[in-house]
Amino acid sequence: MALENLTLLVNGRQAFPEIIRCIDEAQTSLEINMFIWRDDRIGNRMAQAVLAAADRGVTVYISVDRYGVVLEKCEECKRSFFHKEQTLTEKMKSRLLEVFYPENTQPGAVKDEHTDLYQRIMAHPNIRVSADVFKADHSKFYIIDDRILFLGGVNIEDKENGQDLSGRVYGDYMARLEGEEYVRAFREKLATGRDTLEDVFFGLNQKEPVRRFEMEELYLDLINGAQQELHITMAYFSPLEHFVEAILAAHRRGVKVTVLIPQRANFQNDSNRRTICQLLKGSNGGIRVWLSPKMLHTKLVMNEKTISFGSTNITKKAFNQLDELNLFVPNDDSEFAKAMLESIASDIRISQPVTAPGEVEYNRLIAWLEGFMV
């Protein structure tokens, strides 16, 4: 199967119009699995497209993890499209998490409304919604007519479609895979854990129907398998000892290692900085580290042979607790791979290089607390 059937969508400004276009053309079925779905402009635009599809007879299934309500209510507009009420425990967790965000520009307490659009979706006979189940499912994907699959790291929220309330431009990726064979392979992976394609495969953390957590090992395989180049762009990058050592070992065997993280992450900023300080110190500045002015929500690990991106951060929680989903594709001369390499190069061109640990400041206590939490 040719990689021409794959399209890279860089950030929400490319992804959302394409996803909505495909929903507008859906004829039989639509499945959406989402971590965060806010009651904001893009959240309502997506909901309108879903409702229109259901009105013309498309069968719709939406799963929005209950886990996400804590994050939906602790930043940005603080309005959730599907989670209209919080338990006392969820409210307390949201208030606690607010402490760990570097900027406090989001509004105060906001009451969610049962909007007309929300009520029409919840009452529609062609739409089934699962929003109250706590699955700890961080993956994001859409399946349309069992023929088109979108997956990646983009939640349904305005900040992914431009910038957040602190002015940080968001960077992220989705992939569009067209062809019934891709959807069949994806469903087979979800059901049995088997990989059935030769040119691409799906990396999965999954608790049901059988617990399969493979993303930690797959990331380490990419790092340990690098012989020439290793690139990591990571939104939330914890200083896990075995990952730091694997990256340093790659540097010691002559691999060109580059790491790109947000200059001001919306969360886990101090933990991110602690990680790059360890990498810079351990390599005597030999590892090339860049701080992006964007809020890179990306989760990308790439060597000279393989590119992987999706929903999986390098954190304890991602590897041990959360359902995650990544796409693995060849790093070859395909248009998909070329688009990814150009996107990475474009991000690096506007980023600030860091060559020594002393150039990076962070709060050790906050970094420790962030590491404890995630």
Annotate each PLM feature.
Residues 1-374:
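Charged, low-complexity intrinsically disordered terminal segments
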